[in-house]
Amino acid sequence: MKEAGKIFSVLSDEMKTFATLTIRDLTKSFDKQHFANNHISLEIETAKITAFLGHNGAGKSTLLNQMIGFTKPDQGDVCYGDISFVQNRKRARSMMSYMSQQYAPLEKLTVEQNLEMLGRMRGLNTLDLQKEMDQLLTELEIKEYRAKQGKDLSGGLKRLTSFAMALIGSPTIILLDEPTNDVDPIRREKQWQLLQKLAHKGHTIIIVTHNLLEVEKFADNYALFNHGKLIKSGPVQQITYQKQYQISFEFRNKDSLALFQDYTIINGSICQIEIEEKELTRLLPKIKQELDRKNIFNLSLAQKNMSISDLYREELTN
């Protein structure tokens, strides 16, 4: 056990010299017809929280399993610097922690025993282990349950224990699959705050989630998947800083609506449209022309910032 901890420590120190976790042309098919992951390439920033988004079955969990080496890709690689995780799966597991959607705590071990087991595997000495356990249990507000066995915990407490197990020992790369499911709003926020602290210390964090509001509030980057393909990726702020406009007006006949690709008709003759700033700039002269001709009237214009939810709907419903 001491030797395993020593190796983990050495690898963690070595990791600090590398800039990015890189996914290169990663491909996986389980039935030779449908791709779980279809030629995915992505660079994931160090010291950032990256959220993997997409519908159920989009390939997010499969991607995490390939990254840590539980599933072997049909082709492609996952690298950290010059280290290939596909070629050396043991090394990948030494450098990463992984929280799956299933509950991790062993049923007959207490919360504390589960954490202690993982902490010792990751090389923590007794003093540091106790300190980290106390800190995690306190910050997640589950200290009072430390002596409870896994089988006696509620779903939310099992999820929080699994989360703490992924964080104990501060692995350099942390993979989390829907870690806030079943967790109450107060503790969910504390989970994200812990992840932000780790990211600020230089850790690479990847989280699969369907909670888009939390992504906007806490994540640095996003990657959006659909049917096994990477659709779009980038900084969250790049999306939320984009201006979007909501236009409402009444129309005399539907011919005026030919200007717009997408619109919603409310109460018969009232139309509502949401468009981005560049599209509004293009359409303004034509809208003015329709106003002058009195084909449309009672025009109102409201500005708002685009959200991750807007991006999600736009990319996955077209």
Regions flagged by a language model, labelled:
Residues 3-23, 27-39, 89:
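A short, flexible loop at the N-terminus of ABC-type nucleotide-binding domains that lies
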